[in-house]
Regions:
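Cytochrome P450
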Residues: 50, 66-70
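Short, hydrophobic/aliphatic alpha-helical segments
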Residues: 11, 20-47, 77-78, 126-152
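Acidic, carboxylate-rich catalytic segments that either coordinate divalent cations
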Residues: 84, 115-220
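Short, small-residue-biased leader/transition segments that mark boundaries at the very start
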Residues: 1-7
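Conserved phosphate/anionic-ligand binding catalytic regions in large, soluble enzymes, centered on
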Residues: 34-61, 87-96, 139-175
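A structural-propensity feature for long, helix-poor, extended segments
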Residues: 72-108, 197-208
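Short acidic alpha-helical/loop segments enriched in Asp/Glu that coordinate divalent cations
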Residues: 57-62, 73-77, 120
Length: 220
C-alpha cells in the first residue's frame, strides 16, 4: 500500500503543471480580468471537462476494457486505425516525438502491475503502442500509462479526471498568482476570414414575422 501511495503522489506531480494548456490559459485569461481565484479555477475545470483536454486517461481505460485480452489487442487496434478512429492516449500538441513524462509513468505502471500480479494490461499496452508507432508514428502521452495504473490501484474510471483536477489545481493556482503579479488584460486579436459581402436573405422574412407578431399582440 505504501508503494502505491507513493506512485499515486508522483503521478500527481507529473500532472500538476504543464505550461499553457487549455485549462491553464483559461485560468489566466479569467484572472486577467481581475476576477477572483474561485472563478479562475472554476473556468479551468470547465475547460478540462472537454474530452479533447481532460478525460483522456478515462478513455484509455475504456479502450483497454473493450480489448479485454492481449490476444485481441492487435486485431482491435488495426481495425480502429483502418476505420480512422481516434485512439486516446496518443499524440500531443507539443511533443511530436514522445511525451517526456511517459517513461516515468510507464515505470510506475510496471511496478503497480507487479504488485497486483496482473500483466494483462501491460501486454495490451505494449501491443497497441507498437502498432501506433509503426503505422502512425504517433507516440503515447502521459494519459496512456496513467489510465491502467489508476485502474490497477483500484480507482473507479470516473474518478480519473477528478484526480487530474486535484493535481492540476496546484499549477492553476501558481499561474493565477503569476498573472496577478504583473497583470495585463489578455485580449487576443481575431482575424476575420469570412466572405467580404454577405446577403442576408432571411432578414426580410424575419422582420415580417416579427411585425405580424407585434400586430397580434396589439390586437390581443
Amino acid at each position: 500500500v505504501g508503494s502505491e501511495m507513493c506512485i499515486r503522489d508522483r503521478s500527481l506531480i507529473l500532472y500538476a503543471e504543464h505550461g499553457f494548456n487549455v485549462s491553464t490559459f483559461t485560468a489566466r485569461t479569467i484572472t486577467s480580468s481581475l476576477s477572483d481565484i474561485h472563478g479562475a479555477i472554476t473556468g479551468a475545470i470547465a475547460s478540462l471537462k472537454g474530452p479533447l483536454h481532460g478525460g483522456a486517461n478515462e478513455e484509455v481505460m475504456h479502450m483497454m476494457n473493450k480489448i479485454k485480452s492481449p490476444n485481441n489487442a492487435l486485431k482491435w487496434i488495426n481495425n480502429a486505425l483502418d476505420k480512422k478512429e481516434v485512439v486516446m492516449g496518443f499524440g500531443h500538441r507539443v511533443y511530436k516525438s514522445g511525451d517526456s513524462r511517459v517513461p516515468t509513468m510507464r515505470k510506475y505502471f510496471a511496478k503497480v502491475a507487479k504488485i497486483k500480479k496482473d500483466k494483462k494490461f501491460e501486454k495490451i499496452y505494449e501491443i497497441v503502442q507498437k502498432v501506433m508507432i509503426e503505422r502512425k508514428n504517433i507516440h503515447p502521452n502521459v494519459d496512456y500509462p496513467t489510465g491502467p495504473t489508476y485502474h490497477l490501484m483500484g480507482f473507479d474510471t470516473d474518478f480519473f479526471t477528478p484526480i487530474f483536477v486535484i493535481s492540476r489545481i496546484t499549477g492553476w493556482s501558481a499561474h493565477v498568482i503569476e498573472q496577478l503579479a504583473s497583470n495585463k488584460l489578455i485580449r487576443p486579436l481575431a482575424a476575420y476570414n469570412g466572405s467580404k459581402q454577405t446577403k442576408i436573405k432571411w432578414l426580410n422574412v424575419l422582420l415580417t414575422k416579427l411585425h405580424k407578431s407585434f400586430l397580434l399582440l396589439e390586437i390581443a
